[in-house]
Curated annotation (Swiss-Prot):
The lineage of its organism: Eukaryota, Metazoa, Ecdysozoa, Nematoda, Chromadorea. Transmembrane segments: none annotated. Residues 340-351 are annotated as: AF-2. It comes from Caenorhabditis elegans. GO terms for biological process: determination of adult lifespan. GO terms for cellular component: nucleus. This is Nuclear hormone receptor family member nhr-27. Belongs to the nuclear hormone receptor family.
Length: 353
């Protein structure tokens, strides 16, 4: 679901001359009198056209310049020019048309293509010399350059690029452009590491490994950690193996992982997310959950519901892995203060946490 995906091709308005004369009411978005019905709601032509253009645009919406309730007055919008509040009023009224994502095969194809682009960037690119950590929270894409052939990444470098390319990937999702700048920051900070864990596990799983590693089987931990420290081997192995082994046990398919990752990145229960942000993400997550359930029901028939629950439980395994990684970072900083990653890597870690 990349930014700039066009809106539904179905007709924007459906009405008859008789209904025009017998059913005139206020537009549920702006309050104007109208007899039209757009995107599943009683709404005027202007609001229907606005929503269609907004869904088709790749541009981020500017934050509301006022109090965030420009379209709360039902009888008339307070600040009609505020695109941000207008869009979210459309969402509140159920006008966000996600029907184009209900075609399972097409949705999986889009997610697969999008994920493939992200993985290519991860494997072949690096940040430019002038890179600054705050770029990650900007609405624009992160500036990346081709990785020189002589540049060999260590575990810190791969971990850094994994985070950078995943944050860039998340900013390109369709719904990201509808979030306020504050919600976008909260979304990126709280969501990206779940994706880091999932994507790292998937790459290793697809390589027929039973442990998590970076490309070329580079360990996810620095050599100084694996050579023997006060960081327990049991903790290291839980991080490396728990999620990958569960993927192996379940024999998770490519399609299932794509949809599970989508459910994870559209999580509406992010702390500090506004009500508008929660409503928006919930709309998208419902689409992904329905798609995964449909896939499971088709592929596993009577066992579809239990398969669906088994896959969702993987997100709890991700959470446990994340908790273990937090413990590891604390121990690594305490026991090996001289082996920390480069300054730009540390800047990113501090900035996004």
């Amino acid at each position: 679901m990349e930014r700039g995906s066009p809106g539904s091709s179905k007709s924007v308005s459906t009405f008859t001359p008789d209904s025009m004369s017998t059913y005139v009411s206020n537009c549920v978005v702006c309050g104007r009198l109208t007899s039209l019905f757009n995107y599943g709601a009683h709404s005027c032509s202007a609001c229907g056209s606005f929503l269609r253009r907004t869904l088709a645009s790749s541009k981020f919406l500017d934050d509301c310049k006022y109090s965030g309730n420009c379209f709360e007055n039902f009888k008339r919008a307070i600040h009609f020019e505020c695109k941000f509040c207008r869009l979210h009023k459309c969402v509140q009224k159920g006008m966000l048309d996600l029907s184009r994502y209900t075609h399972l095969e097409r949705l999986i194809c889009e997610l697969s293509e999008f994920d493939s682009k992200r993985e290519t960037l991860f494997l072949t690119m690096t940040v430019s010399n002038g890179f600054k950590a705050e770029e990650l929270m900007w609405q624009s894409s992160v500036s990346l350059v081709k990785k020189p052939p002589h540049l060999v990444f260590n575990s810190h470098d791969w971990g850094f690029m994994n985070q950078v390319t995943i944050i860039d990937f998340l900013k390109k999702l369709e719904f990201s452009k509808f979030l306020s700048s504050q919600d976008l920051r909260s979304f990126l900070k709280c969501t990206h590491f779940t994706q880091v864990i999932l994507k790292s596990a998937v790459i290793s799983y697809n390589a027929n490994q039973n442990y998590m590693s970076f490309p070329n089987k580079i360990d996810i931990f620095p050599e100084t950690v694996t050579e023997g420290t006060s960081i327990s081997v049991n903790l290291q192995n839980r991080i490396r193996c728990r999620l990958v082994n569960r993927l192996i046990e379940l024999k998770v398919t490519h399609e299932e992982m794509l949809l599970l990752c989508a459910i994870a990145f559209s999580n509406p229960a992010i702390p500090e997310l506004s009500e508008n942000g929660r409503t928006l993400l919930n709309s998208y997550q419902n689409v992904y959950r329905s798609a995964l359930f449909q896939y499971c029901s088709t592929a596993y028939q009577r066992n579809g519901p239990s398969r669906f629950n088994d896959l969702l439980f993987l997100l709890h395994v991700v959470t446990k892995t994340h908790d273990d990684i937090k413990k590891y970072f604390t121990l690594f900083q305490f026991f090996q203060p001289t082996e920390q990653p480069s300054q730009v890597h540390q800047d990113v870690i501090e900035f996004i946490n």
